[in-house]
Amino acid sequence: MEPTPMLRDRDHDDAPPTYEQAMGLCPTTVSTPPPPPPDCSPPPYRPPYCLVSSPSPRHTFDMDMMEMPATMHPTTGAYFDNGWKWTFALLVVAILGIIFLAVVFTVVINRDNSTATGTSSG
């Protein structure tokens, strides 16, 4: 047995928005705030924050580098002279970390196996 379809009452449906309303092209009325009373004092003056706060140290470094002439800047290769040392150090640390994890893993596996079989080392 098929369910009976729900019939819509089209008289109570809202009309869809017009193209202008949907695209935001219809004229909008913007109400301005009422003028303040004549005896009202203006808000206190606050200078912009960019004039009050000091720049962060990184921006200070960037500004200092910009003030240096381009001929005094270090060459690009100077930044990579010690790169091989850092690469080697990172490789050694990674290998030591893998060895450490392997040792911990085998100790945990052996401990679980010894408790499961009922043998105790010692």
UniProtKB/Swiss-Prot annotation:
UniProt source species: Human cytomegalovirus (strain Towne)
Pfam families given in the database record: UL42
Subcellular location: Host membrane; Host cytoplasm
Region (Disordered): 1-47
Entry domain remark: Late-budding domains (L domains) are short sequence motifs essential for viral particle budding. They recruit proteins of the host ESCRT machinery (Endosomal Sorting Complex Required for Transport) or ESCRT-associated proteins. Contains one L domain: a PPXY motif which is involved in the interaction with Itch, a member of the Nedd4 family.
Function statement: Plays a role in the inhibition of host innate immune response to promote latent infection. Mechanistically, suppresses viral DNA-triggered signaling by impairing DNA binding and oligomerization of CGAS. Also impairs the translocation of host STING1 from the endoplasmic reticulum to perinuclear punctate structures which is an essential step for its activation. Regulates the function of host NEDD4 family ubiquitin E3 ligases through its PPxY motif and thereby prevents the excessive ubiquitination of gB and its degradation by inhibiting these E3 ligases.
Motif placement: PPXY motif: 16-19, 42-45
Membrane topology (UniProt): Single-pass membrane protein
Free-text disruption phenotype from the record: In the absence of functional UL42, a significant amount of gB interacts with host ITCH leading to gB ubiquitination and degradation.
Transmembrane spans: 89-109
Protein name per UniProt: Protein UL42
GO BP terms, alphabetized: symbiont-mediated perturbation of host autophagy; symbiont-mediated suppression of host innate immune response
Entry similarity comment: Belongs to the Cytomegalovirus UL42 protein family.
Subunit structure comment from the entry: Interacts with host ITCH; this interaction induces the ubiquitination and subsequent degradation of ITCH. Interacts with host STING1. Interacts with CGAS.
UniProt entry keywords in alphabetical sequence: Host cytoplasm, Host membrane, Host-virus interaction, Inhibition of host innate immune response by virus, Membrane, Transmembrane, Transmembrane helix, Viral immunoevasion
Entry annotated with the keyword Metal-binding: no
GO CC entries: host cell cytoplasm; host cell membrane; membrane
Bias (Pro residues): 32-47
Gene: UL42
Keyword set includes Membrane: yes
